[in-house]
Amino acid sequence: MALLQIAEPGQSAAPHQHRLAVGIDLGTTNSLVAAVRSGETATLPDELGQHSLPSIVRYTQDSVEVGALAALSSAQDPQNTIVSVKRFMGRSLADIKAGEQSFPYEFAESENGLPLFVTPQGQVNPVQVSAEILRPLIARAEKTLGGELQGVVITVPAYFDDAQRQGTKDAAALLGVKVLRLLNEPTAAAIAYGLDSKQEGVIAIYDLGGGTFDISILRLNRGVFEVLATGGDSALGGDDFDHLLQAHMQQVWQLSDIDSQLSRQLLIESRRVKEALTDAAETEAKVILADGTELTQIVTKAEFDAMIAALVKKTIASCRRTLRDAGVTTDEVLETVMVGGSTRVPLVREQVEAFFGKPPLTSIDPDRVVAIGAAIQADILVGNKPESDLLLLDVIPLSLGIETMGGLVEKVVSRNTTIPVARAQEFTTFKDGQTAMAFHVVQGERELVADCRSLARFTLKGIPPLAAGAAHIRVTFQVDADGLLSVTAMEKSTGVQSSIQVKPSFGLSDTEIATMLKDSMKYAKDDIGRRMLAEQQVEAARVLESLHAALAKDGDLLNADERGQIDAIMANVAQVAAGDDADAIKLAIEKLDEQTQDFAARRMDNSIRVAFKGQSIDNI
């Protein structure tokens, strides 16, 4: 929804006053900034006419170089030249070191396990490096547009988790820039095409950038963009094509034990070769060694296709899974939008066309389409298009829930629910006199907490000391437009509440998401059985707890024989509950309930006698 224009009494809002806002595609390989000017949306070039800014930052003793200048020095100073920093956002140092890819950087570890780059200017984290990439883009926009920006929309991969999204917002905050919204990259592409082409129906967004792959299935209907399902791989992109080419060239030239400088030189040449093979059947690769030796080799398109075929096949497999999640077939997909520079690779376009059965859309530059969509959205959010009824409905990738007794998961917000969203559910106390309740927020599709991902823990204190089950605690999950989660617990009678904003310290890759989804399907039958067992065990514990309290208070209402029978059945329930037969536990509980019905009736009669003792009929 656009912001309203408000004027002082007696004055009118100035309809001609244009607020300055831009869209930024903070990419793994390149970044762009775009704006709406005179009704036209376009990316903004720098003084040299270059639209894209290489997402590269080099730290020297005296300065910070960003973009093309940093790229020029990357081969000579790889240790202090940070490329593809987006891949480090929200990830732990342990995760990075455990990965297959090696990096030329010297790392240190922060207190919470996140990576720090050791540079001539000290230790910097991925958020600070990202801020350095944003800095020239913001400066370029303000110089071109002629004023201070009132807000920006920054795009992120659809599979970025809360920590990665928050890191992106923090990078902008370091520069004092207001983030109007974080927008999923596929959704931004849909805006760019949807508004221009007035598309309605199901559309696939195939986004293959430098470091990430996202596939999103969207339904476009009268200005509403609803993401039906998302999938992809946050560790697969054009960078991986480059590394395969580099490995091929090293093998042909029989290069081993290469230093970081030569490795960077090879990587740069690999990218050039990849781009050349977009239009040519073959091209010559060339590097010069430190001793002046010149190495050359011919690389053909057929060879390159063979190298990357498995990776391209992985993206198609993700497309197939995501279509299944969305509940649609390829026949229902009206168009496929290509996003990201890596979609220029001929094999990628050929495979996408073969899978979806129609040529993909490429009328908007795939490198610029995301920035253009973000700019359109920024223009709306800042209030320049109050007539716009554009609505964005993104989805969350994994279900969110609360741990309940027995280690069970109570899902509050289901997977693929559109956001922003707010869902509430009521819980109660387990024991008499309970005055506090611990909450464990989890993420995942499995039935037991042990098989899900822990997000956060917090405690609600000040619950009135009532009987078990008498207190009512309302737990509300809110996921905002940026995908950030807030959980609030409130005791209804007193209004006492506690809340937490979930910002996981570690990132969650889409590979892990895919694994969690596969496991939920693979173990579905076992999980249901384990859940049924846990539920019966919890119910047995609740019944025994309640009955122990009742016997302690009113046990004198029973004679010795009656008490003995109840004690024996209670012992049997406890014994059976320790086993793994849910049906046997349920049967034992029912038998105990039947045996104690007369005791419950006596307790009720006794309570009534005590309540009315000493009162006259008139008082009653």
UniProtKB/Swiss-Prot annotation:
GO terms for molecular function: ATP binding; ATP hydrolysis activity; ATP-dependent protein folding chaperone; unfolded protein binding. Pfam families: HSP70 (PF00012). The keyword Nucleotidyltransferase does not apply. InterPro entries: ATPase_NBD (IPR043129), Heat_shock_70_CS (IPR018181), HSP70_C_sf (IPR029048), HSP70_peptide-bd_sf (IPR029047), Hsp_70_fam (IPR013126), ISC_FeS_clus_asmbl_HscA (IPR010236). One of its GO terms (biological process) is iron-sulfur cluster assembly. The keyword Zinc-finger does not apply. PROSITE patterns: HSP70_1 (PS00297), HSP70_2 (PS00329). Keywords: ATP-binding, Chaperone, Nucleotide-binding. Belongs to the heat shock protein 70 family. Chaperone involved in the maturation of iron-sulfur cluster-containing proteins. Has a low intrinsic ATPase activity which is markedly stimulated by HscB. This is Chaperone protein HscA homolog. It comes from Shewanella baltica (strain OS195). The gene is hscA.
